């Protein structure tokens, strides 16, 4: 009924009137802070997508206040300097390189990124190919870099589990990659009585205190500090990869801090390792995010010999505490047609018409 009401009335059907009354009543029951005035003053904003290139492909992804697109482009720019196909999918050298790239990018995320209405993030720097080459120049193929020794780049040198993603394309090639979230399972755990929906706990995406991790282990600094009217930094990474200026891969995923690396690995699986889209989506994944200083791995994602080699290089490896990393949903378009891939890690499906 809530969705039907919003369909009939539009924006005011949620931010004013009956639904707004129900939200405020639930807030008062739970000793919350949101008022009618807060709801009335909220407005969505159009933000330009982040743009990048990788091995001849063009990318469009989500900009701030999501860190996803910026960090995805930064990581791909770093990886472009290495012979990825020669390294081999999920080999010791490949996982080692991914981890070193991810820890540097997530260090930049923690230091530099926040709502651009309140902060001046060095986006040109973070998406610049020269910066990426300099950022990874201290990479050693033989040794892991302890995260304590990895610092954010200097901008003066240059300029959940309750997240849902959908990828859609129509017969004319118009594509949409969309991600929506209430953060953790059931959000804040408060159901709006009479409204039939849960309130989110997106405040956890802010940095409550510099260096203190949130529910996903992510840390941040002043760029993502709590301020009135400010939007928290997220990891949502809805992305469209273009080939010859036309949509080639439409993809995205839930998964909190693992969203960005899930999208990264899926793009690499297709564009570097020549996997079909379902194989690329289903392939085992790993994740690293600077802090904590570990490689998080799905079951069977790292074979024993590779694991021993990574440990010899100095990496710590842990089983991912939620077992599965991300829940990718993707569409690939080529001369043979449209191919949808739903991740078996969750309740996902692919459908056509």
What are these regions (language model features)?
Residues 1-66, 118, 125, 136-137, ...:
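Accessory "access/gating" subregions that flank catalytic or transport cores
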Residues 9-16, 21, 25-27, 77, ...:
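Alpha-helical support elements that line or immediately flank enzyme active sites
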Residues 21-24, 89-103, 277-287:
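Short, well-structured alpha-helical segments that form the helix of a local strand-helix-strand
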Residues 33-35, 175-245, 273, 277:
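Active-site rim segments in enzyme catalytic domains, especially the processed small/beta chain
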Residues 60-69, 167, 179-190, 238, ...:
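Glycine-rich phosphate/pyrophosphate-binding beta-alpha loops
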Residues 66, 155-159, 224-232, 319-323:
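Short Gly/Pro-enriched turn/cap motifs at secondary-structure boundaries
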Residues 82-182, 194-195, 202, 210-211, ...:
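Internal maturation/activation junctions in enzymes
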Residues 230, 272-322:
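Extended C-terminal subregions enriched in glycine
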